[in-house]
Amino acid sequence: MRIVFFGSPEFAVPALAAVAECHEIVAVVTQPDRPAGRGGKLQSPAVKEFAIARGLPVLQPAKVRDGTLAGELKALAPDLFVVVAYGRILPPDLLAVPKLGPWNVHASILPKFRGAAPIQWAVIRGEAITGVTIMRMEEGLDTGPAAALATAPILVDDTAGTLAKRLAPLGARLLLETLPRIADGTVALQEQDSAAATLAPPLAKVDGQLDFRQPACVVSAQARGVDPWPGATMLLEGEVAKVFLPTIVDGQGQPGEVLGLMSHGLAIACGTGVIAFSEIQLPGRKRMPAKALLAGHPIVPGTILGRLNPT
């Protein structure tokens, strides 16, 4: 089939690689290059880098709603669109272009976690199981009927990053299994139950601010769900520190009380339970083991950490 692939981050690369092996990619549509890092150097999306390495034609439109992209893609006479974490909502004129429709690989079991950050919110909300859904796209936000789904467990130490690395190839395999049924018209569609829908909006930096008044299990899920971005943050001796690799450990204390260095890292009491962070990163410093950091920045046990958002 003649396919236009929409995608941007690393998560979308396995799906593009799989489709390119079996079908003709007539265009790869991805986000524009954007400044990144302290130097503000332009960085290309992972999908663009992969596509160029494979000799695939790349489009990076600044706008998708002015009709220009729809006209360009219509001229390519695509059979269908495959959309994987593109990062923009496609307007009706684009959705109407492919003969066999636009299809999305969404990283949740729809209708749960509709939106831009389904992997992150599944971890933050403490879900035990998630998955990927192949969905026929329509104008609503991830509201289209499902063609296929596959499930995966969320492991106790999963971060959003590690979970994404497992879901990406799972989605690619499910897509390859589903495309033949789309092509021959035998695909069976299941309408979503909108009453059961939950949302997964884009994350903001505030979503990483930890509140140790919450139970340790809630703090742990939040810290893992915002890893790698925006990162879990706490106020440590007046500085905003990022913390990583949480483990729930035995102990007790006041919420926000530093209990000292344990085998799993810096231990901090929560509303109920205790959490230990194995690695810490101070502003302008590299991420390092808690033991190494505390050797140069000792914290007296019994210290009560301040809150980034005191409300």
Locate each region found by the language model.
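Internal alpha/beta domain cores that form substrate/cofactor-binding pockets in large enzymes
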Residues: 2-4, 26-29, 57-76, 81, ...
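A residue-level signal for conserved active-site and pocket-lining positions in enzyme catalytic cores
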Residues: 7, 28, 51, 81, ...
